[in-house]
A protein has these predicted regions:
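Bacterial N-terminal signal peptides
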Residues: 11-21
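Sec-dependent signal peptide cleavage junction
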Residues: 19-35
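Bacterial Sec-dependent N-terminal signal peptides
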Residues: 1-9
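Extracellular beta-strand solenoid repeats
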Residues: 79, 92, 106-108, 117-119, ...
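Right-handed parallel beta-helix/beta-spiral solenoid domain characteristic of secreted/periplasmic
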Residues: 98-182, 213-219
């Protein structure tokens, strides 16, 4: 497959780099302890119960639905027990689940054993809508998407240590009999980010995630198909909330294998018409583009299309892609 790099794409693919956790693990509270900055919730797919309050290992939740029903507060931590397997489930975060610069919301793990595994199998569906046709009118711009983790207008959130899949193999998947290249296959993601009604969405960190077997639609390139994909939709009331964009997105130490269509992408926006001139001013980039995007020390293998793309991210404000290895694209 011939690889076409879009304008604004950054990808330094350095052979021999391995994916290692270079960032210290999150510090978590002792069992059952609330701190001045938040509560720790526990989720255990084997021994937990959704009748529990989730605030200790002995009273852990069982399903991710209980996490989605919470209104997380600044400083809250959600810990998934290692060895847990969450079938047909997804995590979905909203604006109301945001942390603060001083007290981010953290999603991590506890216990011993394999990573907690979220096997979404086409569940976790949500409605993507850019609010306007895209620069290429042949590209799909609205419809259903299935994502293992959805981060919608959530800021100051940090997620680490999870394993995510979202393929068509499960008996519970409504598309289990569809071909790999079916033009009508549902769009799927490991992690999808959406900025819409929160102005500039600050500080999203994805660290040490293992994302594999995500069989999204091979044709719908801007419908958050693939491993990790962050987009910007038209705000409900831009005059009130401001221009939607990202600042401080960090994607690091992640391993992605057999993801389709994209590997990692950040920044496609409803404001695409601001970027159609030959030369883009610093003012345009700073106003409409996303800033401080860092993609580093990741490993990608068997990507169905583009590997890593930063789309309309501000070139002067620390957009960086480095120490990343790509093995091969799917032929």
């Amino acid at each position: 497959m011939k690889k076409k790099w879009m304008s604004g794409a950054l990808a330094l693919l350095l052979a021999g780099t391995t994916v290692a956790s270079m960032v210290p693990a999150f510090t978590v509270n002792a069992e059952g302890q609330d701190t001045a900055t938040g509560t720790t919730y526990y989720v255990d797919s084997k021994s937990g119960s959704d009748s529990n309050d989730g605030t200790s290992e002995s009273k852990a939740f069982k399903t991710l639905d209980k996490v989605n029903a919470l209104n997380l507060e600044p400083g809250d931590t959600v810990l998934l027990k290692k060895g847990s397997v969450f079938e047909d489930q997804a995590l979905q975060f909203t604006k109301e689940d945001s942390g603060t610069a001083e007290a981010p919301v953290k999603i991590s793990t506890y216990g011993e054993g394999d990573r907690p595994q979220i096997n979404t199998n086409g569940h976790g569906q949500w409605d993507l809508n850019y609010g306007t046709p895209l620069d290429n009118r042949n590209h799909k711009w609205k419809g259903k998407v299935s994502s293992s983790i959805l981060i919608k207008d959530t800021e100051y959130i940090e997620i680490e240590g999870l394993e995510l899949t979202n393929d068509r193999k499960s008996a519970t998947d409504t598309e289990k009999n569809k071909a790999y290249n079916d033009a009508y296959a549902m769009d799927r993601t490991g992690v999808a980010g959406v900025a819409k009604d929160n102005g500039t969405v600050d500080h999203i960190v994805l660290n040490d995630l293992y994302i594999h077997d995500v069989t999204g639609n091979v044709y719908n390139k801007h419908m958050t198909n693939g491993g990790i994909y962050f987009i910007v939709e038209t705000p409900t009331n831009e005059a009130t909330t401001g221009i939607a964009r990202y600042n401080d997105v960090q994607i690091k130490n992640c391993s992605l294998d057999k993801v389709n269509r994209w590997g990692i992408a950040v920044g496609y926006t409803y404001q695409w018409s601001q970027f159609t001139t030959g030369a883009l001013s610093d003012a345009t980039m700073a106003k409409y583009g996303s800033s401080n995007v860092v993609i580093e020390n990741n490993y990608l293998n068997h990507v169905g299309g583009d590997a890593i793309t930063c789309i309309w991210t501000d070139r002067w404000f620390n957009t960086m892609c480095q120490r990343t290895q790509l093995n091969r694209l799917i032929q």
